[in-house]
Structures are given as structure tokens and as C-alpha cells.
């Protein structure tokens, strides 16, 4: 059947209009863009460390697997970031040019699912504001992260890996204390 060009064009127009709005607001404030980008990185990293070290270490596998799959999807989709169409000076703290899917959104959504703290959801919003991601990148990434979490949980629960890993890790920690 193929892709529906009308839907794709409408979605792109929505993406474009939202990004254009933020570009107009921030185009002369690149220092603010840098600060906002730094905040989004700090929020995501702090939640990852909190989850791994204070909630459950085995979630590290969820983050590693989701990051690897996301990276592969970025290579396959090869979608350009919004700043590419507006102003390349917005390419602050960007290591590659692929927009889809949004790793920040996936990490933030997984962190929200695990902790229930809504504060972490500011990271994907900030990535849209600073022209690092299209709105559709973030929306699809939310769905993708829910799929990652459900798949990870079902695999660990089905095979009983979760409990045996926690017991092993607790013994390892006690042994070296």
C-alpha cells in the first residue's frame, strides 16, 4: 500500500511550524540554547544514575538495549534534525545529525515509567525547543520507549532473570563492602 503522502506532508508541516516557532524565539539567543541543551542532558543523566544506583541496577540493561536499538534506528531513518533546515548554529552538544528517534525522549519516558517523576519529561520538550528533534520524533519515541519497557519487563519476568540477577548483585555488593 505504501506511505500516505498526505499524512506525511501534514505531519511534516506540523513539525516544521512548531520548530519554526521556536527558531524565531531563540535565533538570537544561542547562549540560552546552550543552557537549555545542558539542562536536558543533566536531567536525563541524573535520572539514569538515580535509577541504576538507588532503584534497581538491572535497569542498566534496559537503557543499554534501548540505546543500541535507537542508534540503529537513527542510522536506518537518517532523518535530519530541525536545526539543519533553520540554522546550523543550533548544533550545540550534537554528536551526530540523525533526529529520529529521540534518545533523550526514550530515556526520559523510561525514567518516568520507572520513577513516576514527571520532572524528567522536561528533557524531550527542551530538545524540541532547541531544534534537536521534531515533535513527531518525540511522540514516536514515547511509544517506542513503552514498547522497550514492556518487552524488557516481560523477558525478565518470564525467565526469572530479574530476581536471580538482583540476588547475585546483592551478594556481590555485600562481598566487597
Question: Language model features by range: what are they?
Answer:
Residues 1-98, 106-127:
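Hydrophobic alpha-helical bundle signature of multipass membrane enzymes
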Residues 86-177:
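Membrane-embedded catalytic cores of phosphoryl/pyrophosphoryl-handling enzymes
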Amino acid at each position: 500500500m505504501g506511505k500516505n503522502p498526505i499524512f506525511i506532508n501534514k505531519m511534516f508541516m506540523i513539525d516544521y511550524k512548531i520548530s519554526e516557532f521556536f527558531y524565531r524565539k531563540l535565533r538570537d539567543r544561542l547562549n540560552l540554547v546552550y543552557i537549555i541543551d545542558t539542562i536536558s542532558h543533566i536531567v536525563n543523566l541524573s535520572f539514569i544514575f538515580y535509577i541504576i544506583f538507588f532503584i534497581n541496577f538491572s535497569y542498566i540493561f534496559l537503557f543499554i538495549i534501548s540505546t543500541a536499538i535507537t542508534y540503529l534506528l537513527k542510522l536506518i531513518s537518517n532523518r535530519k534534525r530541525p536545526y539543519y533546515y533553520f540554522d546550523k548554529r543550533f548544533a550545540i552538544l550534537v554528536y551526530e545529525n540523525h533526529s529520529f528517534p529521540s534518545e533523550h525522549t526514550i530515556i526520559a519516558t523510561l525514567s518516568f515509567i520507572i520513577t513516576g517523576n514527571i520532572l524528567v519529561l522536561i528533557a524531550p520538550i527542551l530538545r524540541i525547543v532547541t531544534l534537536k528533534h521534531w515533535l513527531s520524533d518525540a511522540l514516536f519515541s514515547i511509544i517506542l520507549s513503552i514498547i522497550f519497557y514492556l518487552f524488557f519487563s516481560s523477558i525478565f519476568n518470564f525467565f526469572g532473570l530479574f530476581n536471580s540477577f538482583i540476588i547475585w548483585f546483592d551478594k556481590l555488593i555485600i562481598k566487597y563492602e
